[in-house]
């Protein structure tokens, strides 16, 4: 649970920004979005495997030598 103590004479916008930053740092929003709807275990495995393949190809693309530009 995220608790933000509002300091004296602190504007609401500043407190809200601090709250958003701490929630983002804790990863609560991403977890909330992931748990919003039930995902079948097979669908979850399929999504994670597709993400791993995408990361793999992205890593390979970064290691490739650039084509000669002449």
Swiss-Prot record:
Signal peptide range in chain numbering: none
HAMAP family cross-referenced by the UniProt entry: Ribosomal_bS21
Family recorded in the similarity comment: Belongs to the bacterial ribosomal protein bS21 family.
Keyword Thylakoid: no
Keyword Ribosomal protein part of the UniProt annotation: yes
Keywords attached to this entry: Ribonucleoprotein, Ribosomal protein
The species this protein was found in: Burkholderia thailandensis (strain ATCC 700388 / DSM 13276 / CCUG 48851 / CIP 106301 / E264)
One Gene Ontology term of the molecular function aspect: structural constituent of ribosome
CC per GO annotation: ribonucleoprotein complex; ribosome
InterPro entries recorded: Ribosomal_bS21, Ribosomal_bS21_sf
Protein name (record): Small ribosomal subunit protein bS21B
One GO BP annotation of this record: translation
């Amino acid at each position: 649970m995220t608790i933000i103590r509002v300091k004296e004479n602190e504007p609401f916008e500043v407190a809200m920004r601090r709250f958003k930053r701490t929630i983002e740092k804790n990863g609560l929003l991403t977890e909330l979005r992931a748990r919003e709807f039930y995902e079948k275990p097979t669908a979850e495995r399929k999504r994670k495997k597709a993400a791993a393949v995408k990361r793999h190809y992205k890593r390979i693309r970064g290691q490739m030598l650039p084509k000669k530009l002449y």
